[in-house]
Amino acid sequence: MRMRRKKYLDERLDACGNVNLGWLVDYAAEQRGETQQRTLDVREIFGNDNPVHLEVGCGKGGFAVEAARRNPDINFIAVEMARNVIVSAMELAIKENLPNLKFLMGKAEYLEKFFPENSVERIYLNFSCPYPKETYKKHRLTHPVFLEIYKHILIPGGE
């Protein structure tokens, strides 16, 4: 069953500007065949050199918000592809006033294009959709294709 679009979704996303890093990919440009390169400068985004932890599939943001609250010396970036869901996470982060937490909208398959090599200290995959059907296994965040992406952006010895 599809999730119903939240009321005033675009306005709510716009109001989350200070925690919203935007889309990983401009999907319309990608369909037109335009190449995109937007490497994230974490030092510029957060204004410090603290280690970066990445949560892939953050959902409504409960884990990311709590982790950022407990670890103010770590920069957190949470990624979610569902706009209906990530808006709740961003609103919660704004309410908690956490300067060390930002959000990206998009699919995990594009992470490698936007995170520099060896830039993330730890990656979290909490309760991501298991895609139980055999034909959907390539969509699982633990599929070998995704593991290679994570390996590329993780620092040596990263978790």
Report the location of each language-model feature:
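A short glycine-rich, Lys/Arg-flanked "PGG" loop and its adjoining helix->strand segment in the class I
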Residues: 142-156
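Class I SAM-dependent methyltransferase "Motif I" SAM/SAH-binding loop
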Residues: 57-61
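S-adenosyl-L-methionine
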Residues: 1-52, 62-69, 90-117
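Short alpha-helix immediately C-terminal to the canonical SAM-binding loop
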Residues: 86-88
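Conserved SAM/SAH-binding beta-strand->alpha-helix loop
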Residues: 82
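Short beta-strand element of Class I
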Residues: 74-77
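Conserved beta-strand/loop positions that form the S-adenosyl-L-methionine
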Residues: 56, 79
